[in-house]
Amino acid sequence: VSTEGTVSFEGAPRTGRHRMLALDAARGLAVIGMIAINTGPRGDDSPLELFYRVPYGRASLLFVLLGGIGLSLMTRRSRLQQAPLPWAGLLWRCALLMLGGLALQSLDHGVSVILQIYALLILFSLPLLRASGRSLLVVSGLSAVAGPPLWILVQAQTDGGFDRDPISATDQIGEILTGIVITGPYPLIVWAAPFVFGLWLGRQKLTETRLSTRLILWGAAAAVGARLLSPVLVAMFGEPTSHLDWQRLFSAVAHSQMPLWLISGTGSAVFALGVCLKIHAWTRPGVAPLIFLGQLALTAYIGHLLILALIVRPGPDTLAQGVLATASTVAALALFAWLWRQRFSRGPFEALLRAPNPRRTTR
């Protein structure tokens, strides 16, 4: 989760300010989508609930894509000026996200916490921060194409011995690492694809109108095309009879960890990013709550887990209850973000991500 480079409505160059506000808005949308999906319910196939579940398997990919962009922007100066990378800050961030994610997983919210995979994605990406753009695209493509078959192969070799359980602080270190890399709900071998693609996007001129148009068109094509290709391939080669069948590679089901879902979901994320970059109204006061929610994305994410664990669970039982709980949670977190940003430039947990600097306390 990165909000590095976040700016206020004043005092920034016009193009740079628009880019950062658009990223904040996209991050805010990702937070809202994850709140809706994590709140639930997810048991009915009525048209209304299917519409409510549109963010399922998409909001989290948008979150990860934006995380890669944020890391790219955070290290941009070091890359362009051939200066040392901010190793202390990056490692501090990894440690906090890992420990915080493991601690949050112990709460009774019924959510697979995503922060642990962020920590290892940052570590995984450190050798790539100075790599060429082409190398980033190759790594992202390899993760999307080779990660899912490897995921199936490991299951087959272990007789399907892992069930994607969330990783918590009570697990052994080996189980934690194995869970994050391959056996957990967000296997790094698959989820590296959108994160590294975000690293590449962060190097592009996101302020260019032509780029935002391409993101919209190519994102929509990937989102729809991969989704439509799935039933065609299933009709040609048959339905998988188990999670270990190679036909599973044709699945576009959300969080299946398969290529077509990954391409479709990442395409949706790219489309949403392109739309946010295309809009030029982010400085209007009416959208400030969404912007501030995106700037306090980590705080909002942690906050919604606490609300789920302390207030919402074991509900909701119906779609109406889920919509009410989601709307109330989003409203409360947006209000908090708005009030907090009147006084402070960073959210409470965003501020913790900054590595302690002994020079600040010495004279």
Regions found by a protein language model. Give the residues of each.
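Alpha-helical transmembrane segments and their immediate juxtamembrane cytosolic regions
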Residues: 1-363
